[in-house]
UniProtKB/Swiss-Prot annotation:
Leader sequence residues: none
Pfam families linked to this entry: GIDA
One term under GO cellular component: cytosol
PROSITE patterns linked to this entry: GIDA_2 (PS01281)
Residue stretches spanning the membrane: none
Upper classification of the organism: Bacteria, Bacillati, Bacillota, Bacilli, Bacillales
Protein name: Methylenetetrahydrofolate--tRNA-(uracil-5-)-methyltransferase TrmFO
Named cofactor requirement(s): FAD
BP term (GO), one: tRNA wobble uridine modification
Family named by the database record: Belongs to the MnmG family. TrmFO subfamily.
Length: 434
């Protein structure tokens, strides 16, 4: 019981992991290289510094990330407690004073008697129980060691993710199921376009606003994966020879080949989520919504994850991790945070919470806990370890990842309330066993 756990990185995930360990009586060696070595995005030496927005998104239980927060409150999350204490008015969202928030987390974790903080860069993966939570801007030296550990093909340095939509929100009268040239099983939903519809879509796409690039993203940005808006600007017909190619996708209703086709590919095992093939994008989210709703069948599409392209060091978790956030080849090594493929502040902290709980259980000689995918916490762990390893991209919390209810509820709010009610009952039962 006198073993020490190394936690590398004092961001949202690392700070939460350290707290969960320390409160269970486990000694923690918490490494944070700032301020000795800064990242291109951070400005302080504080733990859990929010480098982008100051919003932790929705607080309502009719939203998956709101359910995730409530689950974390049940499990005594340091991050959510700090956010609640440092909140600022933000309507239905939980937003914080970022300076007070970081100071709160830093003080709480740093002052715990079981935590020793070391401000130094870690350049080797330590032996003994360890949680790696170094985030999307992991240092070059540690990235090199992670590449050695995971293999060249399992470590990525940027996101290039297409939008994901809920199948239930699509107009199925306008789309059809088919694979190109009818090869294999019919695996894609196809949205056919006339020339007029394509022209309208094209004009909206090339005039939409993009997110400005940060300086440290520019060098790696377009390696091997071109945003759909950049492709469009190369010529009006470029997309017709790329992701919107209609060849081999005749519409079964007409027997004719459409002028253009947008394909959607199943993204989860339950078949509730679909990604838009080849539509990785850097458009602003409001513009994405407007442009995508010009696609036939997607007029009322619910977007559960917007397309993103940004610097992000992450591993191929389906190949490498268990749902307990343990490395498959080494039980005393855990990963947490955005590095695992969870997307978002709250999701990152939640993964740290699970890694911290399970590292403590390992030292205590107990079985690591696998959270049910009836919960938001468990649905994230399930997604990053069970999804298709060939097309793995980071994901944020959404009800499409939850285990299905088993009953069809048409009203979206009622359906989400049922997801929330079941999740919180499950998490309270789990919390009694921890």
């Amino acid at each position: 019981m006198n073993q020490t756990v190394n936690v590398i990185g004092a961001g949202l995930a690392g700070s939460e992991a350290a707290w969960q360990l320390a409160k269970r009586g486990i000694n923690v060696r918490l490494y944070e290289m700032r301020p000795v070595k800064q990242t291109p995005a951070h400005h302080t030496d504080k733990f859990a510094e929010l480098v982008c927005s100051n919003s932790l998104r929705a607080n309502s239980l009719t939203n998956a990330v709101g359910v995730l927060k409530e689950e974390m409150r049940v499990l005594d999350s340091a991050i959510i407690a700090a956010a609640d204490e440092c909140s600022v008015p933000a309507g239905g969202a939980l937003a914080v004073d970022r300076h007070e928030f970081a100071a709160n987390v830093t003080e709480k974790v740093k002052n715990h008697p079981n935590v020793t903080v070391l401000h130094e860069e870690v350049t080797e993966i330590p032996e003994g129980p360890t949680i790696i939570a170094t985030g999307p801007l992991t240092s070059e030296a540690l990235s090199a060691k992670l590449r050695e550990l995971t293999g060249e093909d399992y470590l990525y340095f940027y996101d290039a993710a297409a939008p994901i939509v809920e199948k239930d929100s699509l107009d199925m009268d306008k789309v059809y199921l088919k694979s190109r040239y009818d090869k294999g099983e019919a695996a894609y939903l196809n949205c056919p376009m006339t020339e007029e519809e394509f022209d309208r879509f094209y004009d909206a796409l090339v005039s939409a606003e993009t997110v400005p690039l940060k300086e440290f993203e520019k060098e790696i940005f377009f390696e091997g994966c071109m945003p759909i808006e950049v492709m469009a600007k190369r010529g009006k017909k470029t997309m017709l020879f790329g992701p919107m190619k209609p060849v081999g996708l005749e519409d079964p209703k007409t027997g004719k080949r459409p002028y253009a086709v947008v394909q959607l590919r199943q993204d989860d095992a339950a078949g509730t989520l679909y990604n838009i093939v080849g539509f990785q994008t850097h458009l602003k989210w409001g513009d994405q919504k407007e442009v995508l709703r010009l696609i036939p069948g997607l007029e009322q599409a619910e977007i559960v994850r917007y397309g993103v392209m940004h610097r992000n060091t992450f591993i191929n978790s389906p190949s490498l991790l268990k749902a307990t956030y343990q490395f498959k080849k080494r039980d005393d090594l855990f990963f947490a945070g955005q590095m695992t493929g969870v997307e978002g502040y709250v999701e990152s902290a939640a993964s740290g919470l699970v890694a911290g709980i399970n590292a403590a259980r390992l030292i205590q000689g107990k079985e690591p806990v696998t959270f049910s995918n009836e919960t938001a916490i468990g649905s994230m762990a399930h997604y990053i370890t069970e999804t298709n390893k060939k097309n793995f991209q980071p994901m944020n919390a959404n009800f499409g990842l939850f285990k299905e209810l088993g009953v069809k509820i048409k009203n979206k709010q009622e359906r989400n309330e049922q997801y929330a009610s079941r999740a919180l009952e499950t998490i309270r039962n789990i919390s009694k066993t921890l």
